[in-house]
Amino acid sequence: MNVEIGNRSLDNENSPIPKEKLTTLIDEVYGERKEKSDFTYNNLIQGILEGLNKHSSFYKYIVTVTDVQNKQSGSNDFELEHYFGASWSSKKDGLFQYCLPSEEDTSSQSVVTIVWISKSI
């Protein structure tokens, strides 16, 4: 049995940044930082937040990364811990999720989540 983690997001019509730009931003920041010896998910999140703030200052952003680990090679036994909750206006606020490209090591998959919250009341 194969397990796939897809890129699913809520309706992105109200996103302050188009889906394609979000995907490009995540890929570029990840590409720049993944090869560095001091790579951490906190560094990745910081780079994504910096890019988001350059695109639009009318929103506050929340970025999370979920790393899915295969507990035993060759099995479909995965470990995932990620919780998210929000109270927002569906007309102004939303989220986008994106799976980072898998490397040769298929025992791990990382998911980036970006949340935007309108600063206006």
Curated annotation (Swiss-Prot):
Taxonomic superkingdom: Eukaryota
Gene Ontology MF terms: actin filament binding
GO CC, one annotated term: cell projection
CDD domains noted in UniProt: DLC-like_TDA2
Annotated InterPro entries: Tctex-1-like, Tctex-1-like_sf
Primary site of residence: cytoplasm
Protein's cellular compartments: Cytoplasm; Cell projection
Ranges annotated as spanning the membrane: none
Keyword Transmembrane: no
Keywords: Cell projection, Cytoplasm
Gene3D superfamilies, per the entry: Tctex-1
Gene Ontology biological process terms, A to Z: negative regulation of actin filament polymerization; negative regulation of barbed-end actin filament capping
UniProt keyword annotation of Lipid metabolism present: no
Family statement: Belongs to the TDA2 family.
Annotated protein name in UniProt: Topoisomerase I damage affected protein 2
Organism name: Vanderwaltozyma polyspora (strain ATCC 22028 / DSM 70294 / BCRC 21397 / CBS 2163 / NBRC 10782 / NRRL Y-8283 / UCD 57-17) (Kluyveromyces polysporus)
